[in-house]
Every structure is written in C-alpha cells, then in structure tokens.
Amino acid sequence: MTLNLAAKKAVVEEVTAVASKAISAVVADYRGLTVNQMTQLRSEARKSGVYLRVVRNTLTRRAFKNTEFECLNDLLVGPVFIALSLEAPSDAARLLKDYAKTFEKLEIRALSVGGKVYNANQIDAVASLPTRDEAISKLMYVMKAPIEKFVRTLAEPHAKLARTLAAVKDKKAGNPA
C-alpha cells in the first residue's frame, strides 16, 4: 500500500513522538509470521505498554533521526517491525523473547537502550531485568532485613530474661522443697 506524502509525514511524526518518550527499542524480522500471530503479538504488546508497529524502513530512519535509537538505522533492512518500550526498558525485550520461543520464525535483530545497540544474543540480559515494581520490592526487602535483625537483637535480652524466669518458676513449682 502506497502512502501519499501527508500520510508519510504523519507516520514519521507519530513514530518520532513515541520514540522520544521510549526507553528502549527492539528491531525484529517478522518474515514467516501469520496474520493471526502478528495480531496476537500486537494485542500482547498493547497490554504490556509496548508500541509495536510495522513501518517502512526509510520512514523509520527519518523518525529515529536525532533520537537515541538512530543507532538502529543500519539494521532496518527487509521486513522488520519496531517495538518501543514506554514504561520499562525490559518490556519489549521480554515480550519479543517470549514470542520468539513460541513463534520460531520471529527473529530478533537488535535492541537499543540508552543509545547503545545490543545484538540478539544479549537481549536475554535485558529481558531478565526486573520491572520497576519488582525492583522496588527487592530494594525494600534489602532495606528492611537489617532493621528487623536489629530489633530482634534488641529484644533478645528481655526475651531471654523472661524465659529464664519462666524456667525458674517451673522448677520451683515442680519442687516444693
């Protein structure tokens, strides 16, 4: 389907706006995927907060110009789509990694975070990053553990005294002499 100039400009503006807010981007080859598989992938992407779009490579290059994803321009060859993570850097990587296991024809080409390109082999490291909520809960656990240990240490002398008094009381109650 050919786009007229106004439609092309609108696509470039939309992708540029999303790319400027995005944290990470993944480029993947969709050759061999069925329409149903792509529809399912798009549906899951919307649920995950990932912007997934098939755009002509020349338009994507224009949209990525002067963004941190300009480093992906060399990989925009052939039938590819872009997936932009808007909430967490690992969202798009995790989504596509899971789908690459299910749909073997989905080929992840590269990932970009912070202006650096990572190849498909390194995507597992980014996909395994915790979400923001998981990271906060782990941090809270790590911060809470020393405080709990300190409180237990402070309470131990009193508890030991109470146990000793209870043992003395039981011993005296057992021996009336």
From Swiss-Prot:
Source species: Legionella pneumophila subsp. pneumophila (strain Philadelphia 1 / ATCC 33152 / DSM 7513)
Keyword terms, alphabetized: Ribonucleoprotein, Ribosomal protein, RNA-binding, rRNA-binding
Biological role: Forms part of the ribosomal stalk, playing a central role in the interaction of the ribosome with GTP-bound translation factors.
Domain of life of the organism encoding this protein: Bacteria
Subunit annotation: Part of the ribosomal stalk of the 50S ribosomal subunit. The N-terminus interacts with L11 and the large rRNA to form the base of the stalk. The C-terminus forms an elongated spine to which L12 dimers bind in a sequential fashion forming a multimeric L10(L12)X complex.
Pfam families tied to this protein: Ribosomal_L10
Gene Ontology molecular function terms on file: large ribosomal subunit rRNA binding; structural constituent of ribosome
GO cellular component: large ribosomal subunit
Record flagged with keyword RNA-binding: yes
The protein, known as: Large ribosomal subunit protein uL10
UniProt-listed InterPro entries: Ribosomal_uL10 (IPR001790), Ribosomal_uL10-like_sf (IPR043141), Ribosomal_uL10_bac (IPR022973), Ribosomal_uL10_bac_type (IPR047865), Ribosomal_uL10_CS_bac (IPR002363)
Keyword Ribosomal protein found: yes
Gene Ontology biological process terms in this record: translation
Family recorded in the similarity comment: Belongs to the universal ribosomal protein uL10 family.
Disulfide bonds: none
SUPFAM superfamilies registered for this protein in UniProt: Ribosomal protein L10-like (SSF160369)
Gene3D superfamilies: 3.30.70.1730, 6.10.250.290
